[in-house]
Regions:
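All-alpha prenyltransferase/terpene-synthase fold signal
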Residues: 1-153
């Protein structure tokens, strides 16, 4: 994960190590899964193995995840469903559907905001929400559309 994103996550999650680890691990899995499905970037066996290890060993053992399992699991389910929808909507779709896919594919940031809520409550979530959205949607729509055209999204 890029340093500037990690700094925002660290601040949004008030330095809560287990919450930060959870979000970083979830991001690692999401990036690997996306690269496997999109086939737009090479992904080596070590990265695939690491993603599966994180999913099956490290996240289930994470104390933050364990404590908030029933609040977090529906968010992960919704994020994965949105990401699957985005992948389908990108395929030969109208520009409108591609614009919708552009938003759906990055909803993992919503999980960060909910983790912030679990750590600091409503006021804290509302404080960090603009920062999180600033990196959640940092990619520009025109670059995304260009990437779809050239097959590198």
């Amino acid at each position: 994960m890029e340093d500037h994103k990690l700094k925002i996550i660290h601040k949004a999650l008030q330095g809560h190590k287990d919450a930060i680890d959870f979000v970083v691990h979830l991001s690692t899995i999401a990036r690997a899964w996306d690269d496997i499905i999109d086939k737009d970037k090479g992904i080596d066996d070590d990265r695939i193995n690491r993603a599966f290890w994180i999913a099956l060993v490290e996240i289930p053992q994470n104390p933050f995840y364990q404590q908030h399992l029933f609040q977090i699991t529906p968010l992960i389910r919704d994020y994965i469903n949105s990401w699957l929808d985005a992948n389908n909507m990108e395929q030969g779709a109208s520009d409108h559907n591609k614009h919708v896919a552009f938003v759906l594919r990055d909803l993992i940031g919503n999980i960060v905001m909910q983790c912030a809520y679990l750590i600091g409550g409503y006021e804290w979530m509302r404080t960090v929400s603009p920062w999180v959205r600033s990196f959640q949607f940092e990619e520009r729509l025109d670059k995304y559309m260009e990437g779809l055209t050239h097959g590198n999204i």
